[in-house]
């Protein structure tokens, strides 16, 4: 086991990506993947899996603030199931509430409005999802 994990922040137009190490509990952003109505370039995801060889994949689970599901929740679950089905890698869902808000805030502090491009926000959200996963002891 390498201790490497990949995280995805699922979206219908852009999917944020981060890679992290379990041993350090840290993550860093990778370029976001463009999606068409939630369908990613599966060849690109396959290349990411071959390059990073993750032990597991974490997919952010979008929930309402009260913990109930929203329309995007089912689509994120489907995305996670497809990754598992196509590539046979272990996939876990992780609560992503407020990750985008936190990502926008952090990027804005670093570079103002210019730093808030969609791909950067999505991948920064994936970093937050993965670091939250590590912080919870997984």
Curated annotation (Swiss-Prot):
Single GO molecular function: nuclease activity
EC nos: 3.1.-.-
Entry keyword set: Cytoplasm, Hydrolase, Nuclease, Ribosome biogenesis
Compartments in which it is found: Cytoplasm
EC main group: hydrolase
Matching Pfam families: RuvX
SUPFAM superfamilies, sorted: Ribonuclease H-like
GO BP terms: rRNA 5'-end processing
Gene3D superfamilies the UniProt entry points to: YqgF/RNase H-like domain (3.30.420.140)
Chief place where the protein resides: cytoplasm
Keyword Transferase: no
InterPro entries from the UniProt entry: RNaseH-like_sf, YqgF, YqgF/RNaseH-like_dom, YqgF/RNaseH-like_dom_sf
A Gene Ontology cellular-component term: cytosol
Purpose of the protein: Could be a nuclease involved in processing of the 5'-end of pre-16S rRNA.
PANTHER family from the UniProt entry: POLYNUCLEOTIDYL TRANSFERASE, RIBONUCLEASE H-LIKE SUPERFAMILY PROTEIN
Entry similarity comment: Belongs to the YqgF nuclease family.
UniProt cross-references to HAMAP family, sorted A to Z: Nuclease_YqgF
UniProt protein name: Putative pre-16S rRNA nuclease
Gene (name only): yqgF
């Amino acid at each position: 086991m390498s201790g490497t994990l990949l995280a995805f922040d699922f979206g219908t137009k852009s999917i944020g990506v981060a890679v992290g190490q379990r041993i350090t509990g840290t993550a860093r952003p990778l370029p976001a993947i463009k999606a068409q109505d939630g369908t990613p370039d599966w060849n690109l995801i396959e290349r990411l899996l071959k390059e990073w060889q993750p032990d597991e994949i974490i997919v952010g689970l979008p929930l309402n603030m009260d913990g109930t599901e929203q329309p995007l929740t089912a689509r994120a679950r489907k995305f996670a199931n497809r990754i598992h089905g196509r590539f046979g890698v272990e996939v876990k869902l992780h609560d992503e509430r407020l990750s985008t808000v936190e990502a926008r805030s952090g990027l804005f502090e670093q570079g103002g409005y210019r730093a808030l491009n969609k791909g950067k926000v999505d991948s920064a959200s994936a970093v937050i999802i993965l670091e939250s996963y590590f912080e919870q002891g997984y």
